[in-house]
Structures are given as structure tokens and as C-alpha cells.
């Protein structure tokens, strides 16, 4: 459903912005419609295929312990999402300062970028569920095996996506940008090739998010998000005035890898990851 929402969003962006010339309002409207369709689609799917997830009368009672767990986890998730969106807004503001060409290149490239690593993000969410289920069942061995398998699968997929984005960046940009817009395409290619070379970083980060949420430590996911976004914003604003928009592109993966290092270091020290092979 996320993939459908992304495709619908792209199509509606082109229709509202290019055909109807609604500008920013058109982009916002396209996003709302796409997200609404995705949400309703998921609801209908659950009602039709997952009957056991539907609440019954016996479930309709207040449980303070469950409420507290939901409150604590959701609050941390809200903080994480707020930090992410705030960082994205700051980066967007910096990009806008470079003019219309850079804004257009960034808008097109980010859509491609987001679509490219979307499966890795969803894989991280599924990994979180796997970890949580086995943590609740005290299946430490399965968690260890699952972590190793997840790393292998994510690494292989990220390398494949990196190859496609890096070597076909121009063709991907031409999906959204007219061939005559040479400067926009050039900047978009630069963005995609820099990000594309570093998808291992974002793949690892999504696994770390999923792992720490699954073992009941969502606060660590928030810390990693703050490190990733904080590094991105700080480096972008520090070096963009002298190095240009290229500094913004490089700040993004540097933030990923710094957060990865922090998450892995914590896992080794506190989660005993080095004991997994013993």
C-alpha cells in the first residue's frame, strides 16, 4: 500500500502541478489524497483478510498496563517522527536558498530516492515485528539468527539498488524532468549518485530502528534519528555556503553512517552482539 501511495502521489503531483498549475497547493493535495487512499486500502484489507485482528466485545475494557505501554512507545515514536520532519524541513529550506533549479532537481531526485529505498524501510518494519515476537517468547537464538539473516538480505538488496540508481541516474531523472532542463538533470544525477553509493547506510539504519523498537528500546531509535538528522542539518548548513548544494547531498549519508556507528556500538556494548557467534 505504501508503494501504491507513492505511485499515486507521483502521478497526482504531475497532474496538479504541471497540468492544473496548482503549485505547492497541488503537491500538498496530491500527498493527502495518496495517503488517504493508502490508509483506506489498509483498513479494507484488514477487515477482509485479517478477521482475528478485529476487536470483539471481550476486548472492550480498560487495561492500565497496556495503555501505559502504548503511551510510552507511541510518545517516543512521535518524537522520532517529529525530529525527522523538522530536519527535513530545515534541509528543504537550505535547498530552496539555491534557487528554482536546485529545488526542482531536489524534488525529483528525492522522490526517486525515497522510492528506491522504500523496500528497505518496510523490511526494517517487518524486522521489528519479528524481533518483538521472539523477544516476547524468549527466543534469543531466533533473534540472533534473524539479525544475521536480516543483515545479509538488506546488504544484498541495498547493493542491487545502489547499482541501479548510480548507473541509471540520468534515465531516472528523465522520468520527471524534460530533457531540455540540462542543469536540473545534472544536479539530480549528482544527488542520486551520491545517495545511491551509500544505501548500505540507510539500510543498516532501518534495521537498527527495527531492532531497538523490537527489543523494547524505542528511545535508542530516537537517539539514532537525532544523530542522523542532526548531523545532516549541521553539516549541510556549515558547508553548503562554501561548497554549494553538493555539501547537502553528502551530509545526508554521513548522518546515516554516524547513526549506524552509534547503534552498532551500543549493540556491542549493551546487547552483547559479539556473543552471537558463541
Segments the model singles out, each with a brief description of its role:
Residues 1-11, 25, 29-32, 123, ...:
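Alpha-helical transmembrane segments of multi-pass membrane transporters/permeases
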Residues 2, 114, 120, 182-208:
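Alpha-helical transmembrane segments of multi-pass membrane proteins
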Residues 5, 34-38, 42, 46, ...:
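Transmembrane helical elements of multi-pass membrane transporters/channels
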Residues 7-18, 43, 89-93, 115, ...:
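Alpha-helical transmembrane segments of multipass membrane proteins
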Residues 9, 26, 84-88, 99, ...:
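Functionally critical, cavity-lining and gating residues within the transmembrane helices
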Residues 15-24, 82-111, 115, 133, ...:
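Helix-terminus/linker motif at the lipid-water interface of multi-pass membrane proteins
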Residues 19-75, 131-198, 239-278:
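Short alpha-helical transmembrane segments in multi-pass integral membrane proteins
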Residues 105-163, 167-169, 202-224:
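Small-residue-rich hydrophobic transmembrane alpha-helices
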Amino acid at each position: 500500500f505504501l508503494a501504491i501511495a507513492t505511485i499515486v502521489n507521483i502521478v497526482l503531483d504531475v497532474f496538479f502541478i504541471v497540468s492544473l498549475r496548482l503549485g505547492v497547493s497541488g503537491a500538498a493535495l496530491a500527498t493527502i489524497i495518496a495517503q488517504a487512499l493508502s490508509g483506506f486500502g489498509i483498513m479494507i484489507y484488514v477487515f477482509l483478510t485479517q478477521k482475528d485482528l478485529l476487536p470483539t466485545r471481550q476486548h472492550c475494557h480498560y487495561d492500565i498496563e497496556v495503555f501505559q505501554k502504548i503511551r510510552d512507545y507511541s510518545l517516543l515514536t512521535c518524537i522520532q517522527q517529529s525530529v525527522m520532519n523538522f530536519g527535513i524541513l530545515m534541509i528543504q529550506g537550505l535547498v530552496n536558498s539555491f534557487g528554482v533549479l536546485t529545488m526542482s532537481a531536489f524534488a525529483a531526485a528525492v522522490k526517486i530516492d525515497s522510492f528506491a529505498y522504500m523496500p528497505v524501510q518496510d523490511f526494517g518494519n517487518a524486522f521489528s515485528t519479528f524481533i518483538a515476537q521472539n523477544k516476547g517468547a524468549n527466543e534469543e537464538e531466533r533473534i540472533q539468527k534473524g539479525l544475521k539473516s536480516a543483515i545479509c538480505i538488506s546488504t544484498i538488496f541495498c547493493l542491487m539498488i545502489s547499482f541501479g540508481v548510480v548507473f541509471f541516474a540520468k534515465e531516472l531523472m528523465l522520468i520527471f524532468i524534460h530533457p531540455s532542463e540540462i542543469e536540473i538533470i545534472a544536479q539530480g544525477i549528482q544527488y542520486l549518485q551520491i545517495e545511491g553509493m551509500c544505501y548500505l547506510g540507510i539500510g543498516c539504519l532501518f534495521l537498527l530502528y527495527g531492532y531497538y523498537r523490537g527489543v523494547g528500546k524505542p528511545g535508542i531509535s530516537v537517539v539514532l534519528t537525532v544523530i542522523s538528522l542532526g548531523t545532516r542539518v549541521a553539516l549541510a548548513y556549515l558547508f553548503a555556503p562554501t561548497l554549494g548544494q553538493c555539501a547537502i547531498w553528502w551530509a545526508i549519508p554521513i548522518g546515516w553512517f554516524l547513526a549506524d556507528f552509534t547503534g552498532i556500538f551500543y549493540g556491542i556494548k549493551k546487547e552483547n552482539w559479539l556473543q552471537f557467534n558463541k
